[in-house]
Amino acid sequence: MENRKELAIVSCCNTNFVPHLAAMFVSILENSPSAAAVHFYVIDDGLSLSSKKALRQTVSSNSQSATVEFLTADKEVYQNFLVSDHITTTAYLRISLPSLLQKYSYKKVLYLDADTLVLDDIVQLYDTPLVNQTIGAVIDPGQAYALKRLGIHSSDYYFNSGVMIIDIDRWNEKAITQKTIQYLEENGDR
């Protein structure tokens, strides 16, 4: 028998994105036969009870081994940060992800934006070795513009935070949550 993996997948969601998140759940469950179980964690940005029920039903009707759990981040931490049509408060909540998962023993988690569709076995992405890196992510194609706007040196990288593999231990060791919040407090107008 092959060694099948249990996966921890995290998303942030508000009520407007519930249909997208449900589609993402189904796309993962239908396209990831090598996963023994998928544990979905949703950082809840004001989901209604009916939305949570719909998401639970989506998961249970598509897999006997998948679960969904809702997590609550302290939104007050992010209330004074720049919000636009491109960056919402919901987007900031992923920064709290490692602290929200402290009671679990995950070494690695996969973060996916709620509107992500998965068309292949997600285990392949989940198994990507991080090789002493805190996250695995894709450099944003608009990096040159973003670097200039954010005042980031060109040797640093601006990445798309919609798909990230996160080494929870390294994230915590390097105090990424605290450093990110500090950066946002000091550069919130960019």
Identify what each model region corresponds to.
Residues 1-190:
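Glycosyltransferase catalytic domains, chiefly GT-A lineage
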